Amino acid sequence: MKVIDQDLLEKVIIERSRTSHKGDYGRLLLLGGTYPYGGAIIMAALAAVKSGAGLVTVGTDRENIPALHNHLPEAMAFSLQDQQLLKEQLEKEEVVLLGPGLRDNAFGEDIVKQVFASLSQNQILIVDGGAL
């Protein structure tokens, strides 16, 4: 376990170059927000962007995407039901947050299994909420 203290924060939170772009600050994939828990994934995505994550992509129920874009137009989003797109996203992300608002049912269990089977050792997985 890592302790978050002042020294760590000073190393992580740095002034950004005026010529940089969001792609310079990592790629984060958030997976969750299945019915009726869409708000959880939207709040997680907002927190990710506000805390400095670079390219943020959200996999959620299709019905949540308009609300997500209303709060966070810069986020990319796709339907979790699109298994091919989920597979492609899992291959290219650096960090995956799995679980905010993920319903505890067969579909949620399938998503968890797919994520665990797909990630490589150099990717970071954070498990939260319904994925626990």
Show the residue positions of the predicted features.
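Active-site ligand-binding patch in enzyme domains
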Residues: 132
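Small-residue (G/A/S/T)-rich helix-start motifs and N-terminal tracts that mark the onset
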Residues: 1-125
